[in-house]
């Protein structure tokens, strides 16, 4: 399968000629490369925000489970 992938690589001199012909386009590619390089750093905090809400609901359920038995214990002596 690697032999089939070689011909597209040999056809790339057209792109190389386009880069040499227009320095403005090559500069635009460099700026675009910088922008794409910054994007992964922006995605990482978003992944942390997604992970945090998953932990909070589990922690919110535990205190609610602890509070319910206490209320039931307080009500029981009043009935007696």
From Swiss-Prot:
Molecular function terms, GO-annotated: DNA binding; structural constituent of chromatin
Chief place of localization: nucleus
A single Gene Ontology CC term: nucleus
Subcellular location(s) of the protein: Nucleus; Chromosome
Keywords: Chromosome, DNA-binding, Nucleus
InterPro entries membership: H1/H5 (IPR005819)
Compositionally skewed regions (Basic residues) per UniProt: 11-80
Domain of life of the source: Eukaryota
One Gene Ontology term from the biological process aspect of the record: nucleosome assembly
Transmembrane segments: none
Record keyword Zinc present: no
Residue segments, region Disordered: 1-80
Record protein name field: Histone H1.M6.1
């Amino acid at each position: 399968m690697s032999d089939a992938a070689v011909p597209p690589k040999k056809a790339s001199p057209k792109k190389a000629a386009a880069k040499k012909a227009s320095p403005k386009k090559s500069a635009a590619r460099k700026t675009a490369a910088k922008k794409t390089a910054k994007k992964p750093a922006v995605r990482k905090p978003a992944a942390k925000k997604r992970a945090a809400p998953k932990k909070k609901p589990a922690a919110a359920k535990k205190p609610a489970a602890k509070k319910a038995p206490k209320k039931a214990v307080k009500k029981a002596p009043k009935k007696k």
